[in-house]
Amino acid sequence: GTKAMQEFEPDCIIAVGGGSAMDAGKIMWVMYEHPEVNFMDMAMDFMDIRKRVYTFPHMGDKAYFIAVPTSAGTGSEVTPFAVITDETTGVKYPLADYELMPKMAIIDSDLMTNMPKGLTSASGIDAMTHALEAYASVMATDFTDGLALKALKSIFTYLPRAYNDGANDPVAREKMSIASTEAGMAFANAFLGVCHSMAH
C-alpha cells in the first residue's frame, strides 16, 4: 500500500473498511509522508500518550486522511490509535499518537447494512467495551462520560435489534454506527484499561 501511494502521490487518502483496514491506512499514511520513520520507534511502550520518549512526525503535509468505517465497533475513524499485527510472529503492536487521528470521518450506516451476525455482535461488544473502559478510566472527564454513557445506552438498546434484524432494521444499524463513533471519541480522550491490554 505504501509503495502504491509513493508512486501515485495522492493528496487525499480514504481508508474504507473495518478497524484493521483503517489502522493499516493510518500506517501507510505515515510511511507515505515520512518514509524515514522506523516502525519499531513508533511502537515503543509508553505510560502516557501525552508524555512520549518518541515524537511522532507531523502528519497531513502531503495528504488528507479520511476514514470511512464499514463496521460498528472499533471507532478507529475518530481515534489516535492503530493496532498493527506482525503476520510472521502474531505480535500485535498498538501505536498511539494524536498525529494518527484521521482528519475526517464519514459515518454512513448504509455501508454496515449487510454485516453478518457474527461481525455485528463482535464489533458491537467491542464498542461497548470501549465505552465502559472510557467511563471507568482515571482520565475520564464530564465530556468523555457523556459520550460513553450515551454510547452504552444506544448499544444496549440497539445491538440486539441490529443482531436479530440486520438489514431489516436500518434505524438500529444507524444508532449502532453512531454509538461506535461516540465510544471511539470517548476512549480517544479518556483511554482504555486492562481489558484491552489483556486482549492484545
Where in this protein do the model-derived segments appear?
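Short glycine-rich loop/turn motifs that provide flexible caps or phosphate-binding loops at active sites
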Residues: I14-G18, A72-T74, S123, A183-M185, ...
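Contiguous, well-ordered alpha-helical segments that form the cores/surfaces of helical PPI scaffolds
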Residues: I27, T181-M185, H200
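C-terminal catalytic subdomain
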Residues: A190-H200
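Glycine/threonine-rich beta-strand-loop-alpha-helix active-site module
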Residues: T2-K3, E7-I107
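Secondary-structure transition/capping residues
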Residues: C12, E36-F39, M139-D142, G166, ...
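Carboxylate- and glycine-rich phosphate/diphosphate-binding segment that chelates Mg2+/Mn2+
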Residues: P80-N189
